[in-house]
Amino acid sequence: MSKSFQPTRLVGAIAIAMGCSPVIFAEDATNATQLDPIVITASKSAEKASEVPARISVISKEEIEKNPVLNLSDVLQKDASIYIKQSGGVGQLTDLSLRGGQTGSTLLLKNGARLNTQNGLGPVSPEFINLSDVDQIEILKGPASVQYGSDAISGVVQLISNNPTKSGASLTGVYGENRTYKTLVNADYVDDSGFYASIGGQRMETDGTSIINIQDKSEKAAFDQKGYNAKIGYSNDVINTSLAIDQNQGTNNYTTNYSTNNAKRNFENRLVNWLASYKASSDLVL
């Protein structure tokens, strides 16, 4: 008989933030939420969400940060159009699909780069994706195969990372049951010339729980993940260019065919992304 587990309940959290300003005040609620955000997924160019001729929803950075462990599955399942099927607790494989479609018909992007696997089985597991540098998640609901190909028949989920706007650094730590912990560190540099740089790292580890109840107590669904992201760029009124790298790797224990012994899976994903644009006029951006 198999058991169903919910994601680990957090029992403690610490956060230390260091920035240019010694005191940080909460923004007024009316300013914290952007009522008409700028999106790029629908037409591959920046436009207001209200002007997009398609159904699209946006998850803001504030909503992402409400999940202390920055788990993509937990963030996405708040949207009614997203179906999440998780095979156990933290770090176990998760299927993601849009509006009742097949997993392989939902496209996952980060800054325009595809994160779907090459075998047509759909996006890489959301558990293996680092959200520490993500500022916005756009969910395009409905067929988008004309823009993105056959694996976007159900829709597109895109993770957007924006450029840093001020110099500063932060350190965050989270601890929970089953010896679960996650640490994140990030540092940004911005100067008046338009140059900027950002670097961050994260580590998550948990002992997990037994996947099925016939297993020995020592056979647990452990998960170990670490990664980093770095970005440099230059931006002014005419030119915008950047080079970014995102590396994520680790191991997770899982069970196959309800056997009594767990197997170990190693995972690694690396994303290198170069972007450049030139504003030729007020109406033309190349």
Q: Would you name each region that the model predicts?
A:
Residues 100, 161, 189, 234-236, ...:
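Residue-level signature of outer-membrane beta-barrel architecture
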Residues 73, 77-113, 135:
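Extracytoplasmic beta-strand/coil segments of soluble accessory domains associated
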Residues 36, 94, 155, 169, ...:
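Hydrophobic, lipid-facing positions within transmembrane beta-strands of outer-membrane proteins
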Residues 113-141:
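Short acidic/polar hinge/loop motifs at secondary-structure boundaries
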Residues 31-33, 81-92, 114, 121-122, ...:
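Short, glycine-/polar-rich solvent-exposed loops and beta-turns at beta-strand/coil boundaries
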Residues 158, 166-167, 174, 186-267:
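Periplasmic-side early beta-strands and strand-to-turn transitions of outer-membrane beta-barrels
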Residues 1-67, 73-77, 188-189, 226-228, ...:
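N-terminal Sec signal peptide and the immediately downstream disordered periplasmic leader
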